[in-house]
Amino acid sequence: MGQRRIGQASLAEALLPAGAGSNRRLERIAGLIDWSPFERLLAPLRAPTGRPGYPPLALFRALLLAQWYQLSDPGLEEALADRLSFRRFCGFGLDDGTPDETTLCRFRAVLAERGLAERLFNELNRQLDERGLVLKAGTLIDATLVEAAVARPPVSEGEVSTKDPDAGFTRRGQRSFFGFKAHLAVDLGSDLVRGAVLTGADVGDSLAADGLVQGDEAAVFMDKAYDSATRREALAAAGIVDGIMHRGHARRRLAAWQRWMNVALAPIRSQVERAFGTLKRSYGWRRVRYRGLLRNGAHLQLLCIALNLRRAARLAA
């Protein structure tokens, strides 16, 4: 049966006053990139038989709206039915039906199960790179903790939660923390996210770092938690400037030049915090929304797509 046809011209559309439902931010984002590669990536999600489904690209755009406006599935269902600017961004006409929360939830789950969120993220970054928005002057790599969606397990369960075995324990200062850790690679100067990995909170920051080095940047900046001779040697071998802060030890204090380097590197490295702040404050991601690495990892990719689209729209303005 294929998919439903949406966005057809209607009398209701023709009777709308000029400027009705206008949203310049969404209009800029809609015209920012070529959406056809996204449509091709999502094409396998079309049902070959049975009742015609909604176009996967329309559902994907709807999920982006949910990130920007911090909407739950029921809230997104209501907004799509009610807000003209949302309908237009997704491609729905006034006479078209819009997806319910169950459809949206199932679509998001399929994105995660098929690993499509990461492929969509990579396609966006490919296009942003082609437009010259990715500066490649440096990559900022760091990690942040995000609380689990479930309560921490009782002492009787030990260190592994029966409700979410993928979440892990670590310490933040003097306090125990239960949840996940988001590792990001952020482009210096543009603040575009170039790489994102989610792990349990118990995974060390340094373990995900090497996979976040892009290979085409001029320099890499990390805090002292990532300091290792092997990593510095690998960056040198790749011709990448080493911007890792130096870590002192009880038996070996930092030399004066290392302390000076740390002072110089600190304000550069700290710029990665803007991306974390945006995810947590503007996108409400202080706590993950789902259980398990699979769905939460896909959600992180979706959040980064939303973040990059908004950032790119400002950069290209």
List the model feature ranges, each with a label.
Residues 78-81, 90-95, 99-241, 245-247, ...:
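Polybasic low-complexity intrinsically disordered regions
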Residues 218-219, 224-298:
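Helix-centered, glycine/charged polyanion-binding patches within enzymatic domains
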Residues 34, 51-57, 96-99, 297-301, ...:
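Secondary-structure capping and boundary motifs in well-ordered enzyme cores
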Residues 19-69:
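Basic, short loop/linker segments at the boundary and entry of helix-turn-helix/winged-helix-like folds
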